[in-house]
Amino acid sequence: VQTLAQLKAGELRGITHLKISEQLTEFPMEILDLAETLEVLDLSGNQLNAFPAEFAQLTKLKIVFASNNPFTTLPEVLGRCPNLEMIGFKSCAIKEVPANSLPPKLRWLILTDNNIEQLPDTLGQCVHLKKLALAGNQLTSLPQSMLHCHELELVRISANQLTECPDQLLNLPKLAWFAFSGNPFSQHNLELDTVPCVDFSQLELHHVLGQGASGVISKATWTHNEHQLPDEVAVKVFKGEVTSDGYPNDELQACLKAGSHPNLVKSLAQVQQPDNLALIMDLIPSHYQNLGLPPTLVTCTRDTFPADFSLEQTQIDKIVQQMRDVFTHLHQNKVCHGDLYAHNTLFDRDANILVGDFGAASMYHMLSESQQQQIRQIEQRALEHFIDDLASICVQTPDKIVA
């Protein structure tokens, strides 16, 4: 993180990345002095509500982040930035996305947790768009023009006001990761009691095991174990607010609807109290580790792996077969995982896997038969990408080439 003082003193000339978070109320015009080199600008966590027209002078700019600022309109000037590929305005107060605010090279648009009611038809002209995050807005429909967004691979439209399933997305040729829970069109009245409800006071939380967008997972023991569950368990306590993937309760319900499978983290019980929403799960053995790393700003939608990481073909074959089984099981239960990735998969040295993180999961039993088939086809692409990604880290022997 750099400082405003450094910027004003001219100490930052020649830099490619700039991040300033100092409760700024006005865009520092000195940033324009960096136009010849600046590629990444992060002004998240300030008090900005506008960018000046001169912002378009930042012709080398590829990425702009301005989350947690009180913008009510996505700045139109962004549309005049010739090389801008990535825009992140999460948790602002945006109501309006002007027709000319979307730049020609846009690949990645994050507008999660705003107040957007409508998107412009010009979104359909964003032919390079690969990743679109719109969860937690007030959208009642999506532009029909989006059927032209043929490069779209990842879409988040959960926690909106969409009254109809957006068919213009279901036929997109590359869409692979799709989250749509928490909308009127995906509403359901299932109250899943496949696992018992327990009182939060029956649990004693210990150290944190991990955390994600939707909650914190801790190791726990029982103060009162009325259902004879394992003595030691993992408890995911959900945060109250909307996440980049949707509402926490939709994640909980999807987990329960997914049911039991040897390669899914087992759900044991649930807490459904006004101030506590939690899922009690089997503790994952400590010898399991992450199979992959999340996508980067460069790979956009595709997973990455540590530089020295590789797998034998026999290990990959075993992992792939288990993931195929998980896929079949989930879709028999009409659950779309929405985030089928190596980085959401744990594995051990014997190539046994456990799939978790249902934050982007959506139930789809309420959709038409043809829509259900399309949802399955979308996730089938994610499965194929998962297999391709593993093939990229295969140790190949000279006489055996992976097809």
Report residues per predicted region.
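Activation segment signature within eukaryotic-like protein kinase domains
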Residues: I319-V320
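C-lobe/activation-segment region of protein kinase-like
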Residues: L354, G359-V402
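ATP-binding glycine-rich loop module of kinase domains
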Residues: G215-A254
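Short beta-strand micro-motifs within the conserved protein kinase catalytic domain, predominantly
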Residues: K266-L277
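Structural motif at the C-terminus of the N-lobe alphaC helix and the adjacent alphaC-beta4 loop
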Residues: Q253-P262
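The feature captures the LRR N-terminal capping module
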Residues: V1-A53, Q57-T112, Q118-D121, P173-A213, ...
